[in-house]
Amino acid sequence: MSADVVVAIDGPAGTGKSSVSKGLARALGARYLDTGGMYRMVTLAVLRAGIDPADADAVGRAAQAVRMSVDYHPDGDRYFLGGEDVSTEIRGDKVTAAVSAVSSIPAVRTRLVGLQREMASGPGSIVVEGRDIGTVVLPDAPVKIFLTASAETRARRRNDQNVAAGLADDYEAVLAEVRRRDHLDSTRRVSPLRAAPDAVVVDTSDMTEAQVIDHLRDLVRQRSEVAR
């Protein structure tokens, strides 16, 4: 692309958001930032410190004290907590189970939103992925996209990923977790999951990853031309 552009991509888990966002960033020659990884780093720090994720005051203090950084890479960002590469550990089951509770705490979101805005303001185009990018983090982004898919489709995708990774084949348990996470994300008091009024909503239920990336690339080009 000839001009820099900021693309905000939001949506619930299991919509293909991460893989699509990475693919779109590669197609655009843009940087990529997964803001969910930052919430996972704070969650990991909280768990390592033995803090109850429901203790808002203690979690808030931990969020303010944590030292984190993100190393941009075309194949996926690397996440560093106090200088330690925790890119794999933040994707573990314990962090996954606690991240919704931690990310719902206002002090955590305040700290990370500021960091995310700083990262997005750097030179060049960037694709920023999360759950409140178009509504809170980057409300003035010229391109806002909200990915969605049925809970059943998202659970099937996640279960297939688990099986491929050698984990248990348990679709019903995964579906229950998807619905639980949806409820937590959409009803939290601070920055609930929702599409921005000017976001383009894309249902990925019946689309392949390549089809979604191609569609979003066209949307970005169209919106970028309009925004000039």
Swiss-Prot record:
Record's keyword terms, sorted: ATP-binding, Cytoplasm, Kinase, Nucleotide-binding, Transferase
Residues engaged in binding ATP: G11, P12, A13, G14, T15, G16, K17, S18, S19
Matches recorded under CDD domains: CMPK
Predominant subcellular localization, coarse grouping: cytoplasm
Reactions mediated catalytically: CMP + ATP = CDP + ADP; dCMP + ATP = dCDP + ADP
Family annotation (Pfam families): Cytidylate_kin (PF02224)
Gene3D superfamilies xrefs: P-loop containing nucleotide triphosphate hydrolases
Cellular location(s): Cytoplasm
Gene Ontology CC terms, in alphabetical order: cytosol
EC number: 2.7.4.25
Gene Ontology biological process terms, A to Z: nucleobase-containing small molecule interconversion; pyrimidine nucleotide metabolic process
GO MF, one example: CMP kinase activity
Alphabetized NCBIfam families for the sequence: cmk
HAMAP family: Cytidyl_kinase_type1
Family, as annotated: Belongs to the cytidylate kinase family. Type 1 subfamily.
Name of this chain's protein: Cytidylate kinase
Organism of derivation: Mycobacterium avium (strain 104)
Primary gene name: cmk
